[in-house]
Amino acid sequence: MNKKFKYKKSLLAAILSATLLAGCDGGGSGSSSDTPPVDSGTGSLPEVKPDPTPNPEPTPEPTPDPEPTPEPIPDPEPTPEPEPEPVPTKTGYLTLGGSQRVTGATCNGESSDGFTFKPGEDVTCVAGNTTIATFNTQSEAARSLRAVEKVSFSLEDAQELAGSDDKKSNAVSLVTSSNSCPANTEQVCLTFSSVIESKRFDSLYKQIDLAPEEFKKLVNEEVENNAATDKAPSTHTSPVVPVTTPGTKPDLNASFVSANAEQFYQYQPTEIILSEGRLVDSQGYGVAGVNYYTNSGRGVTGENGEFSFSWGEAISFGIDTFELGSVRGNKSTIALTELGDEVRGANIDQLIHRYSTTGQNNTRVVPDDVRKVFAEYPNVINEIINLSLSNGATLGEGEQVVNLPNEFIEQFNTGQAKEIDTAICAKTDGCNEARWFSLTTRNVNDGQIQGVINKLWGVDTNYKSVSKFHVFHDSTNFYGSTGNARGQAVVNISNAAFPILMARNDKNYWLAFGEKRAWDKNELAYITEAPSIVRPENVTRETASFNLPFISLGQVGDGKLMVIGNPHYNSILRCPNGYSWNGGVNKDGQCTLNSDPDDMKNFMENVLRYLSNDRWLPDAKSSMTVGTNLETVYFKKHGQVLGNSAPFAFHKDFTGITVKPMTSYGNLNPDEVPLLILNGFEYVTQWGSDPYSIPLRADTSKPKLTQQDVTDLIAYMNKGGSVLIMENVMSNLKEESASGFVRLLDAAGLSMALNKSVVNNDPQGYPDRVRQRRSTPIWVYERYPAVDGKPPYTIDDTTKEVIWKYQQENKPDDKPKLEVASWQEEVEGKQVTQFAFIDEADHKTPESLAAAKQRILDAFPGLEVCKDSDYHYEVNCLEYRPGTDVPVTGGMYVPQYTQLDLSADTAKAMLQAADLGTNIQRLYQHELYFRTNGRQGERLNSVDLERLYQNMSVWLWNETKYRYEEGKEDELGFKTFTEFLNCYTNNAYVGTQCSAELKKSLIDNKMIYGEESSKAGMMNPSYPLNYMEKPLTRLMLGRSWWDLNIKVDVEKYPGVVNTNGETVTQNINLYSAPTKWFAGNMQSTGLWAPAQQEVSIESKSTVPVTVTVALADDLTGREKHEVSLNRPPRVTKTYDLKANDKVTFKVPYGGLIYIKGDSKEVQSADFTFTGVVKAPFYKDGKWQHDLNSPAPLGELESASFVYTTPKKNLNASNYTGGLEQFANDLDTFASSMNDFYGRDSEDGKHRMFTYKNLPGHKHRFANDVQISIGDAHSGYPVMNSSFSPNSTTLPTTPLNDWLIWHEVGHNAAETPLTVPGATEVANNVLALYMQDRYLGKMNRVADDITVAPEYLEESNGQAWARGGAGDRLLMYAQLKEWAEKNFDIKKWYPDGTPLPEFYSEREGMKGWNLFQLMHRKARGDEVSNDKFGGKNYCAESNGNAADTLMLCASWVAQTDLSEFFKKWNPGANAYQLPGASEMSFEGGVSQSAYNTLASLDLPKPEQGPETINQVTEHKMSAE
């Protein structure tokens, strides 16, 4: 019972991360297995601080003359004392499964979705008034985890749940069922809208030690049926929790990063920012009439598609209980196509197009008739209309073109989808035809992202060429050396954004494509000396890997936001050929240096051209105004200094650009100012004595953009404006002052919260660093140290191949490390280590250089100068290595700047979305990463993962026979693609074979079974399966439904059959005349089609039939299931069997066989099944097939129900009367349902759903391991997620089971009870009837009804709208209890008129007579109409269901119940605009209905139903 009516909005704590600063890396260990100092987001960033040794004097750099704003010459650098590092504070997140965040609870007094803790202290999490989880965090104090700032705590790992799988299962079940934001797939909200909800949660959490099935029933009745209404299209919540590999961290700095870590960097609002949005179709027209739901409000999209929301929250869209999809509210225009992945999004757009009418200005309007039809199929509508089916994509490039079927459109030609489609089209004057035949003409290599990169890099010849990209270094000063390369990470966290530039981080990262590698694939040097035949391979894009981006681009509406992670790039605009080192401008504004190449000028010209949408063109007579909030640019120079400064301006080479200083951005017109160059923060210009402080980084305590500025900038970009930000944000961005900046980036799908540089220096360093380069050429002798007096390798005399000892002995820990050779030499009486290293810069004459070389040769007798002049990384000889021409600085030999090679190949390699072969390989490497706990493979950014996974699903989820043809262009990478397919299909595809190397890897990593297994050649489905961790397995599992060459291990689901098939003939009823769709005539055969075995069915019927194998929901694309699949997502197969014909088929996984005819005449026919095995089948009171029949599932068929369940359940050990009693109870329930709805005839208006003389028409109830929506859902069959193959008990008790009453009640619910908002209520009235009839009282409402009158008084005439489903149920309960003493059914049946038997005079049941007569009257019953005015107010409708309910109840009761209905106002809807403190209301009973009721002049009750505060209790005797 809700005593508080305002929805609470929990403020979410910011979740953006902090990481340690990168230090300097002057030297190196000389290890060949050293990774570059910057990682790709999959490993921790080491913190390297200089040794506290005496600080040599810096080498002063020449100062240009004149210098207009000279910086003071820095003092000699301080020698920092080593300090004990404090244990860093970290940010924790309470999660389910490590990835689904829990909000609304508190941990250590802060929000559970981002709380601070210190490693070593306990974390205690509370929901309601209950401690639900305690965690020990001592392990987080490990030094190896210092760089990891974000930590997820899984509820399942709580100390309270340790050692009990039942407790874990029950705790998760309760939390997911209590979710108050079911539309948000990333979070679970434990925000209770009333004290009662909170107490209910507390009470249930204390009972988590119950058996799971018992607890599930308790939760289903107590929680799910009190669901907060109007929070999502469907309030059915799924108990599925993401499955994640133990040890993953949601921090991109971790060594083992979780698959969805990027979500933890999204903007989380700390304040309510009221926003207006628009829902549009793919043509940009507004979509009106769609329900939307957020945590802060709800409503229906307006005439132009407008809706209100609070920035950053999840927004869900739907029509009645039909779920269209949900998005984060971080933009103001949301397209239907964005509500799902590419395929689903196109289907949503097509569905709305089909069922909408055209409004003003070409808007799409969803009429109320669509909602009404959908309402007849509550929840199951999501299963009937499948939005994830393929939609006729055309795939390919050049000659390689594949056309896929349009399953989405085809589904409306058969079954219940056809019935719904026909009904809607009849009510809306015909539906719209498909807008185009192929909804998505898509090409995996469509190149949109690649095209943008090619433009900006100048690969596109219409743009300026950029071959070397300049990366500035930090302005720190250790030992006279400048800081490390600084490209601050700008991560794309949604598919609205993509990277523009990522630096390489593979082992040969500093070598350009086409150069010879320094390291081989095992990170060993190439042994090229005689007699070895080993030759170094070239660096190629196939072996390249990349760090996270430091330049990224995001789309916001029609505009763009580009972010570059360093402020020095602004100086290139001022002096495009004088920026790299010690640049500046003189007093006349002229650049003091002009020696830098054109590459970066060209890059900036490309950026300005692209961001302005070609409004500005270089070298052309074009002009553009650029707005900015920058006043000054600073040039990079030596020392810990800001650098030379100059006013922000454009060099004259950027012709035609005018700068407009700006401080506000409201109503800015992109036509007038197409581009803004902004900073989010002031610069850090003071740093005291901190030698690690980096000048010019963003001072996040001093924002330059307010939240209003950000709102205005987003509006500006939506209209087509572009924003360029060049800034070094070294912060985890948790500060309140940074929230506007974070929101701005988030709107474009970007985040800078990673707080790390992602560019490696060139490998310069101390002389002992292997593989290094200097500005000038060097000479170096690199070698592997001897082991036991011998090299760590041998060269085979015969094959000339190099054999490494550690590999031969399988001792990976003994892998040798390359070193720069050294020797000891006495200097002034001391032994000093001398390295075999020469920098030519130290030798001014040829004679000096020759002497230095000879000194090394003399130190190592037999050493020679290397002979291969084309390869500069030879070992075991004195090697010449050319210089880079980039000056190095100071005693740590750090280059002044770093250069990245750009080329067409680099562009393709960076994006790595070029072809199918690359894509499938990348997904495989991503899966290896998780299967090996990060030791192998490479993790994909979650945005890239989604993009590649969706692309590949389009290619793989069909039955196309792909092939590779030698000698033809292979633009799409079919060679690699088909090789992978062949590994899963035992070489069924033409042109390639599964290579031994790939096959071994797949077997070793448990993706397919090897020859030693009894399942050799099968794929391992790896349940529970999370596509974000194992995308290749998920893709192949999806394909296995079409491609029977992929054989899936079915041991876990549905179960293995080890019996040979047999031939069986059965006579099957084909008559079809259902009263309602949910009691249909699909016939069970009790036969099983084994997986991958040929089955044939021969028909002697004179009518065609449909054959169905397996009854299971399609889980494809259902986000909550895709992260924890326990079975193949698609299982059901259907086949058409013509009259007197035969059909032969194989099914992928096995399943029970069903036959459905459509004969309008009573008839049956023989069918002969070949290759089938028997399943346990109890029918007509006996076993037709024994319980020990081979199939894993069995069925019970009673007179009214067919019940499907794992066969052991059919032992029915929980039923004293066994299956006979269970069957009788099912039939009793079916008969009682007929009674409740007043159905007692075999034809006409009051025809029963099921009855003896309607053979073959029955309700269906099936148990499955995973279902599409909720714990259970309505439909034909009703689906239930209770699936316990090892249990001997039946999970259902038909005469005491809220779940079956609730779901079957959904199917049967009908007018006049089905008012708006009653979807999860009207069905439960049947359940109350069952409780009264078989348990003696309405237990479900017995407690809540005691305070119902007070609740009505406090609700101010809006009790319905303010309440949840449980509260609304009280309205019907009060009406029934009032009728118990105030309604006499006999008044309606005068003497001589027989009283139908379903009416009852029993105490506690008499009140139901009112409902039964209301149902009959709504169907047009005529008894005594003439006696009571002649007009049937239950059968007539003005279109308002709430009016009908009030008039019907009052007329049948012959009592004016207006006061009761005024207090409840059923059918009303509450909505709350973001920021509003009070709810608003709409709908409900109309004034005209009250006027009509008043005109009937019915007596008012002495005590109306609104006064009822208790239920009638009847002491039960056997009925």
UniProtKB/Swiss-Prot annotation:
May be a substrate of the type II secretion system beta (T2SS-beta). It is a lipid-anchor. InterPro entries: DUF4092 (IPR025385), M60-like_N (IPR035423), Pep_M60_3 (IPR042279), Peptidase_M60_dom (IPR031161), TCAF (IPR051244). This is Putative lipoprotein YghJ. A lipid is attached at residue 24 (S-diacylglycerol cysteine). It holds the Pfam family Peptidase_M60. To V.cholerae AcfD (VC_0845). It is found in: Cell membrane. Keywords: Cell membrane, Lipoprotein, Membrane, Palmitate, Signal. Residues 1-23 form the signal peptide. Disruption phenotype: No effect on assembly or function of T2SS-beta. Residues 51-77 have a biased composition (Pro residues). Residues 1080-1380 form the Peptidase M60 domain. Residues 22-107, 226-247, 1497-1519 are annotated as: Disordered. It comes from Escherichia coli O78:H11 (strain H10407 / ETEC).
